[in-house]
A protein has these predicted regions:
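Sec-dependent N-terminal signal peptides of Gram-positive bacterial secreted proteins and lipoproteins
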Residues: 1-17
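Disordered, low-complexity segments in secreted/periplasmic proteins that are enriched in proline
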Residues: 18-67, 164-171, 288, 304-306
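Surface-exposed loop/turn motifs in large extracellular/passenger domains
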Residues: 62, 67-84, 99-117, 125-150, ...
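Beta-strand-rich domains and repeat architectures in extracellular enzymes and scaffolds
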Residues: 88-99
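Terminal, low-complexity, charged helical segments
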Residues: 406-407
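Surface-exposed loop/turn positions within long extracellular repeat scaffolds
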Residues: 420-423, 436-446, 460-461
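Extracellular, surface-exposed repeat architectures
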Residues: 456-470
Length: 470
């Protein structure tokens, strides 16, 4: 079965580590797949968005048109139930298993192996070419148990492509992958564990995923977005520009262990969202990728590559643990972001102990604006807001902050980013407190001054020392 898709006018760049690369590696070294290199480890298409490549990387502009010939070593084109079968491909740009049907397909205990590199970044990153398992055309496919192993560049483990042609915000064709109790291992670049694009949907339960290549998030999405729901399991990424989760979609993860051993733990690009419920997230971001000039655990940005629509990015975490071994815990740049935390245990092991930075980085064209909502939450560490940036901080329901707010910011390259603080609004409800660890500077303060514990320091509101603090 040969399916030809004409793709028109792809435009994009990538973040510091895009999922794939479009001719240039946004993160720096590494294979030059077709996407651009975003922070999460993805490359950008051959060009770079206004600021260059996006962090986690999503595709960039790509070619003006592309003909995609889909093929699979095994192809399913109608309703099917299979159990205990082996699906293997060693041919470039061929999937081990291609499911292209509007019907329901059920697969139990498969053994999937895929080698043979993809020739093109956009085709493998946006449309599913060369995946271990590719599901498309509106199929409802359920996979239970078994293993999926890929050892090629541009070879995502399982790919749900929703058929919207990479149009962000457009509805997909109903393609839905439900996968549970499966072990997935990928070793090549631009090879995520579970991949969702084009308005596809993925439900994943109790998976064991390990990725090792650049731009290879364990839970990965790209242009056209979609919906991803994960419950249970372990998700580990080891490569450059490869966060545990890279979001250009709506992603909810519950009761899971998420680990990134080189890159950010989570990357959100543009008008997209990640919600973590009772998860344990650990990141050790020790190497910058692409345009990124900071090291961080939660990276929220807009690459302007075209992989994600511009708008408010949202990161929500309820319960669980967040362990940041290197760099800033949260970093917001070139976008508007809302961070909501409730009852999360945060452990910041970095010597500088910076909780949040909102400032310029390696991308341009957007603003640096963040809102941090903390409910029943303990926060500790410095908050840095650049002179061209804005922060709204709200503490409620017995939340506490031990830290200082200022605008003195130096990036991981040692370059000065800001010397003066931007616009900062802080609100404390009657049950929440702020203990200063240094002189702090805000534009607006709402709440009782007595809920601020000076600890020998001064809180300045529009340049005037706040009176009535403890």
């Amino acid at each position: 079965m040969t399916i030809v898709l004409l793709v028109l006018g792809l435009a994009a760049g990538s973040y510091a580590y895009a999922n794939t690369q479009h001719g240039s590696d946004q993160f720096g070294d590494g294979p030059k797949m077709a996407q651009g290199a975003p922070p999460d480890g993805q490359g950008g298409p051959g060009g770079q968005g206004p600021g260059g490549t996006p962090p986690d990387g999503k595709g960039g502009p790509g070619s003006s048109s592309a003909d995609i010939d889909y093929s699979g070593a095994v192809e399913i084109a109608s309703k099917e139930t299979e159990s205990g079968k082996t699906y293997a491909s060693t041919k470039g740009d061929q999937s081990a298993l291609l499911v292209a049907t509007t019907d329901e397909v059920t697969i139990t205990n498969p053994t999937v192996t895929k080698s043979g590199d993809s020739d093109g970044g956009d085709n493998s990153n946006f449309y599913g070419l060369n995946a271990g398992v590719l599901v498309k055309d509106g199929s409802k496919t359920t996979i239970t148990g078994g293993t999926i192993n890929t050892s090629a560049n541009g070879a995502n483990g399982i790919f749900s492509y929703g058929g919207n042609g990479g149009q962000n915000g457009a509805d997909g064709d109903g393609t839905t992958v439900t996968i549970r109790d499966t072990k997935i291992v990928t070793t090549g670049a631009s090879s995520g564990g579970i991949m969702t694009t084009g308005g596809g949907t993925t439900y994943a339960y109790n998976l064991d995923i390990t990725t090792s290549g650049q731009s290879s998030a364990a839970i990965r999405t790209d242009r056209g977005g979609g919906k991803v729901v994960v419950d249970g399991g372990k998700y580990t990424s080891n490569g450059l520009g490869s966060p545990a989760i890279y979001s250009t979609a709506d992603i909810t993860v519950s009761n899971a262990t998420l680990t990134s051993n080189l890159s950010e733990g989570v990357c959100i690009e543009g008008l997209n969202a990640i919600t973590l419920n009772n998860c344990n997230l650990t990141a050790n971001n020790t190497k910058r990728n692409g345009n990124a000039t900071f090291l961080d655990t939660i990276m929220i940005y807009q690459s302007m590559s075209g992989d994600a629509a511009s708008g408010t990015s949202q990161f929500t975490m309820n319960g669980g643990t967040l362990t940041s071994k290197s760099g800033h815990v949260f970093h917001v740049t070139n976008t508007n972001a809302v961070i909501s935390l409730k009852g999360v245990t945060i452990e910041n092991k970095d010597a500088e102990s910076i909780l949040l930075s909102v400032c310029a980085d390696g991308w341009q064209g957007g603003s640096n604006v963040a809102t941090l909502n903390a409910s029943a939450q303990k926060l500790s560490g410095a908050i840095k807001v650049g002179s061209d940036s804005q922060l709204t901080l709200k503490l409620t329901d017995g939340s506490t902050l031990n830290g200082a707010i200022d605008g003195k910011i130096t990036n991981a390259k040692g370059s000065t980013v800001s010397k003066e603080v931007g616009k900062v609004s802080v609100t404390l409800d009657g049950t929440s407190t702020w203990t200063l660890t240094g002189d702090s500077y805000v534009t607006e303060f709402n709440g009782n001054a007595s809920n601020v514990i000076s600890n020998g320091h001064t809180l300045y509101v529009n340049g005037v020392a706040l009176k009535g603090v403890k």
